[in-house]
Amino acid sequence: VSYNSKFLAATVQAEPVVLDA
């Protein structure tokens, strides 16, 4: 999921709950 690192970083700033999903 290294390619998702940037996506996750931007998403976690908007919705930290996404990481839990």
Curated annotation (Swiss-Prot):
Segments traversing the membrane: none
User: Does the keyword section mention Hydrolase?
Assistant: yes
Asked if the keyword Hydrolase belongs to this entry, the reply reads yes
Which catalytic reaction applies to this protein? a nitrile + 2 H2O = a carboxylate + NH4(+)
**One Gene Ontology MF term:** nitrilase activity
Name the keywords, alphabetized: Hydrolase
Name the family the entry cites.
Answer: Belongs to the carbon-nitrogen hydrolase superfamily. Nitrilase family.
List the protein's name.
Nitrilase
Please give the organism.
Answer: Acinetobacter sp. (strain AK226)
